[in-house]
């Protein structure tokens, strides 16, 4: 997934790429790019598959470690790709906000 909108107190950017995996209702992802050297998240989907709750931890390019928790609303774009609207709360610093992510097109798809 890629970031399409970032809250001013967020640190993900258009350069941040997230690679998700799912096993039943458990979801994990590794992400990096922009000011994030490496990040991980782990969470669960609700029974309807309409929302995702997770905690994340990340290290930035300066070596600072941050963590937070999020709730994402899951929807679909007209072309069927996933769209996540994340409401996040920092646990290691003040602030909360909203980020938006969309599933990237697979290689060979029309742009």
Role assignments for model-derived ranges:
Residues 17-44:
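N-terminal glycine/threonine-rich, aromatic-flanked beta-hairpin/loop signature
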Residues 46-49:
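Short acidic-glycine loop/turn motifs at beta-strand connectors
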């Amino acid at each position: 997934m890629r970031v399409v909108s970032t809250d001013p107190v967020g640190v993900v950017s258009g350069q941040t790429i997230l690679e998700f995996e799912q096993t039943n209702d458990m979801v994990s992802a590794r992400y990096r790019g922009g000011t994030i050297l490496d990040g991980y998240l782990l969470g669960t989907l609700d029974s309807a598959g309409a929302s995702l709750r997770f905690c994340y931890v990340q290290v930035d390019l300066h070596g600072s470690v941050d963590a937070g928790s999020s709730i994402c609303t899951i929807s679909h774009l007209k072309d069927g790709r996933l769209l996540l609207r994340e409401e996040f709360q920092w646990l290691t610093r003040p602030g909360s906000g909203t980020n938006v992510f969309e599933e990237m097109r697979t290689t060979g798809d029309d742009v």
